[in-house]
Design a protein with these regions (language model features):
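Flexible, acidic/Gly-rich N-terminal and inter-domain linker regions that tether
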Residues: 1-9, 17, 56, 324
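C-terminal scaffold of the Radical SAM
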Residues: 5-7, 24-49, 57-310
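Local cysteine-cluster metal-coordination motifs and their immediate loop/turn environment
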Residues: 11-26
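Beta-strand-connecting loop/turn residues
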Residues: 15, 179, 252, 332-333
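Basic, glycine-rich polyanion-binding accessory segments appended to enzymes
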Residues: 277-345, 349
Length: 352
């Protein structure tokens, strides 16, 4: 039997409706009975892990919208599996934010909230299919802050311009009191409804415009004491997402539920309901070399950088990037410079 990782991701695929840019597996308009059955299956998987002595240092409830499921039952089964100081994060859609839910989450051990805001412009929010206004998102976040002092948001940049959209100003976040912010560049996924729109390619902002937006966002976030600790993530000191940081550091993680990914030693699984691959949709085994490469490349995305002593054949390429000002080095530790952050995908591709 496999050792159980200390990091757990649980996927809840149900959502209020498919967003225009989303190509992830998700299901909308599902009956309550089906959502309850899914929650019961998740709770049962946790009970089995508990019986095997599982102890998790980080737990992440992702989706979809986890709040559409019976989180009370899931959290009750999770409790015996938590280390004393475990980080337990839950993703919330602004329309799911209600005080009774937040009170239950807090009482059951949740200590971190990530809310998907996605845009600071009402016209763009409507076009995305997000179903709330910026003011509604702000009110929801302020309600979250009444219960949690560790709360952040997600944003997307690079979305097509929408009609006479209001100006997208990051400064609108000045009084929100966020402790964390994830900022992702739009990836036009073939399976998304956005990709099927006529002329969509011509309406996308150019790379330079997206880079300028990311630069402005980063400068603003740093002005309110959020530090960039990964390519797409900023946080107040001590408020970094421990779960994602563990994954980027190369630690193993177990993913439970439809569409969830796991990395357990050399095994990679998708859609498993247990550490031994119970019910998995996919299971594969990678080579030791590919395993090391994957874990090291994740580390390069963070401010901690990667230790090239684990992969000496990269040394020449890494030194080339140092000479170009894309990387900095201290011994065998290599880190992306601010310029390197802008072209991270190019750097990673050169090392694969």
């Amino acid at each position: 039997m496999a050792d159980i990782p200390r990091n757990l991701y649980m996927h809840f695929p149900f959502c209020r409706g498919k967003c225009s840019y989303c190509a992830l597996y998700s299901r909308g308009a599902v009956a309550l009975s089906e959502r309850k059955a899914y929650s019961a299956k998740m709770a049962d998987a946790l009970s089995k892990l508990s019986a095997r002595g599982a102890k998790f240092s980080t737990v992440y409830f992702g989706g979809g919208s986890p709040a559409l499921c019976d989180l009370d039952a899931v959290l009750s089964s999770l409790a015996p599996c938590l280390e004393i100081d475990a980080e337990v994060s839950v993703e919330l859609h602004p329309l799911d934010v209600k005080k009774p839910l937040l009170d239950m989450l807090r009482s059951e051990g949740v200590n971190r909230i990530s809310m998907g805001v996605e845009s600071l412009d009402n016209a763009t929010l409507r076009d995305m299919g997000r179903r709330y206004s910026l003011n509604e998102a702000k009110d929801a976040f302020f309600t979250v802050r009444e219960f949690f002092d560790n709360a952040g948001i997600d944003l997307i940049v690079g979305y097509p311009r929408v009609g006479n959209a209001e100006e997208w100003k990051i400064e609108k976040l000045a009084d929100w009191g966020i402790t964390h912010c994830s900022v992702y560049s739009l990836q036009l996924e073939e399976e998304s409804s956005l990709a099927s729109r006529e002329g969509i390619e011509s309406s996308l902002p150019g790379d330079d415009e997206v880079m300028d937006s990311l630069k402005n966002i980063g400068e603003f976030l740093e002005s309110i004491s959020l530090e960039r600790y990964e390519i797409s993530n900023w946080a107040r000191k001590g408020r970094e997402c421990r779960h994602n940081s563990a994954v980027w550091a190369g630690e193993d993680y177990l993913g439970l539920g439809t569409g969830a990914y796991s990395r357990v030693a050399l095994r990679r699984m998708r859609g498993a309901w247990g550490v031994d691959g119970e019910g998995a949709e996919e299971v594969s085994v990678v080579s030791e070399e590919d395993d090391i490469k994957e874990r090291l490349l994740f580390r390069l995305r963070t401010r901690k950088g990667l230790d090239a002593s684990f992969c000496p054949r990269w040394k020449e390429t890494l030194e080339k990037f140092v000479a170009e000002g894309v990387l900095s080095s201290a011994g065998d530790i290599y880190r992306l410079t601010p310029r390197g952050m802008e072209i991270c995908d190019y750097v990673l591709a050169a090392l694969v």
